[in-house]
Amino acid sequence: MTTDYSSPAYLQKVDKYWRAANYLSVGQLYLKDNPLLQRPLKASDVKVHPIGHWGTIAGQNFIYAHLNRVINKYGLKMFYVEGPGHGGQVMVSNSYLDGTYTDIYPEITQDVEGMQKLFKQFSFPGGVASHAAPETPGSIHEGGELGYSISHGVGAILDNPDEIAAVVVGDGESETGPLATSWQSTKFINPINDGAVLPILNLNGFKISNPTIFGRTSDAKIKEYFESMNWEPIFVEGDDPEKVHPALAKAMDEAVEKIKAIQKHARENNDATLPVWPMIVFRAPKGWTGPKSWDGDKIEGSFRAHQIPIPVDQNDMEHADALVDWLESYQPKELFNEDGSLKDDIKEIIPTGDSRMAANPITNGGVDPKALNLPNFRDYAVDTSKEGANVKQDMIVWSDYLRDVIKKNPDNFRLFGPDETMSNRLYGVFETTNRQWMEDIHPDSDQYEAPAGRVLDAQLSEHQAEGWLEGYVLTGRHGLFASYEAFLRVVDSMLTQHFKWLRKANELDWRKKYPSLNIIAASTVFQQDHNGYTHQDPGALTHLAEKKPEYIREYLPADANTLLAVGDVIFRSQEKINYVVTSKHPRQQWFSIEEAKQLVDNGLGIIDWASTDQGSEPDIVFAAAGTEPTLETLAAIQLLHDSFPEMKIRFVNVVDILKLRSPEKDPRGLSDAEFDHYFTKDKPVVFAFHGYEDLVRDIFFDRHNHNLYVHGYRENGDITTPFDVRVMNQMDRFDLAKSAIAAQPAMENTGAAFVQSMDNMLAKHNAYIRDAGTDLPEVNDWQWKGLK
């Protein structure tokens, strides 16, 4: 028997489904018992503090009901991304109605008892969040911090050609910078290889206490706006369900058929021409179906519908009748049986199995997640038989490795960035792939642009790159986001939100593991002499170090071989944010590939060829974390050894900075005994660090040895010479060597002439660069001589 999905009878069932979702959503706000109002409502049935939001709910439930309809009609693989921040009930209510919630949480049964538990737990101690948190079936996007819904949807459908991301965008959310720029995503979705995004702008007109911009914009101007970005908006407007149901059904059919037509043409004709994708603009009142007014003020269709629209709680039942009237307006007896189960005629129109948006495998670890097939990183090793003699650019070396990662993983590995792949010297990847770019290509002026490619860096937006990568890894694939170190601060709150997702998801047995999020910080603070002070900020190291240690790794490889070893680790890891600070400029190469592997595996190591303590207790410990810190420390050690060959020096190179933390703070941390093995209990430690110094001081605070002299970035910068950036922050060889003398009281007299010579070199440096515009030959031409 053929089903007429647009018939009044079918749409009447859709309406019942919608009312059921609305009923559940209101119940979750207010009730902790008596979920179907089968007896008179009393104070103990109501929460002491109803917490949550109402304004966006009915509109989203309406959209969700109609998405279910097109899933059934067209046999779609579709999932839901809830952009509007405060609408946690939407995905909970709908996943409860379709049974997914009970599949995952069997105690939340499809009856009165289960409904009572569902209501009580919402925004309740020990319960669930008021957003689409990881606890919510079908969610890959919490929506607490606004602006990333489309980016996440796009990241998810890349290389998933059969999937459609139904992304509901709040009209308030659409005013954020990240969301505004994400409308440009049309230029990067390949209709042959990728799936599709169906944005639905939920235009209810109001934010917390202000109107929205789109809410006061005419349809004509909205149409022009979206058409300029290759979207074809389909408008649906109204507040009468009898009229809006057929209107949205027609709009959804039109949108899905256009998506299918675009993909069919592209795939049958191998034609990846930039299409015009459909989207829906859905105008319905904020707080739709809720109280019309309260105490003389308008509620429905007003900002006042945003949160809890009527004042009823366990301690104030004066207006309980209004709450009951609201709930009963959905006619729950038409929707639920006496035992609390859903009526059969409503069940008939709900998708089943993996067709349910809440059960789509893409939302729980991906459709077909696979580990990466990695090349042997040792095959790309740089010769370091004479330490420091070989000069290479670490990112160029690594790009050859990444080129072959792409070759071995042609459909589940991507590079993302804000137009910085070339600037960050990842040249090698373009030997095997291109940038994915759907706009016109001008061969005489463009480079590596093509409709299909494994690099997505042609939009200058850190938010887009980060959001795309998050959507990609949350759906089981792998990748990295490479950007300038200072401008990764643009997305540090996104990194925080991703960390929070990882943490909460990891606490759920049913959530599958995610590949790690890999962030590559290049063009770093001590290499930004040419762009200056604005481009100098290593603070993401400190920002991420403040998060739960189980989910954060920070690597500071000093050379190409160490970067290769780090890459092998991060691409095999899961459930982490891997933050890698690396060099793109020509730098001396220090560690053999096996030394590098050991440094990465252990997190740090004593470098015998740069130490003179011969296993005995040293006079001074030098430590370095980062490219320039390692270079300057080795140069300082050479200076000291040449002048004081009897000084017993130990050099510790640190790659995994957070490994130094106490096990009381980080389960991977070194024990006190291990820490003392490297740094002693009381000998002076001169620590050259790539970032802000307090991170190192915090690490040493819990240790025996407080005899610490940290030289990091001291917030001094300018457009100057490369070495001068280090001098400005006293993270140069001369200041490090001076610090080592000052740290040893016994050398106050014997080291005085040496300290003066260091001051003389600093004065010479300052004079020379202001005359020549380049660094001293003694710096530019410096070579490691060795200590033995």
Swiss-Prot record:
Q: What is the required cofactor set for this protein?
A: thiamine diphosphate
Q: Which NCBIfam families match?
A: PRK05261.1-3, PRK05261.1-4
A GO biological process held by the record = carbohydrate metabolic process
Q: Does the keyword Lyase apply?
A: yes
Name the Gene3D superfamilies on file.
Answer: 3.40.50.920, 3.40.50.970
Which molecular function terms from Gene Ontology are attached?
A: aldehyde-lyase activity
Q: Which UniProt keywords apply?
A: Lyase, Thiamine pyrophosphate
Q: What is this protein called?
A: Probable phosphoketolase 1
Q: Which family does it belong to?
A: Belongs to the XFP family.
User: Could you say which EC number(s) this protein's record lists?
Assistant: 4.1.2.-
> Which top-level enzyme class is recorded in the Swiss-Prot or TrEMBL entry?
lyase
One Pfam family of this chain: XFP_N
Originating species = Lactiplantibacillus plantarum (strain ATCC BAA-793 / NCIMB 8826 / WCFS1)
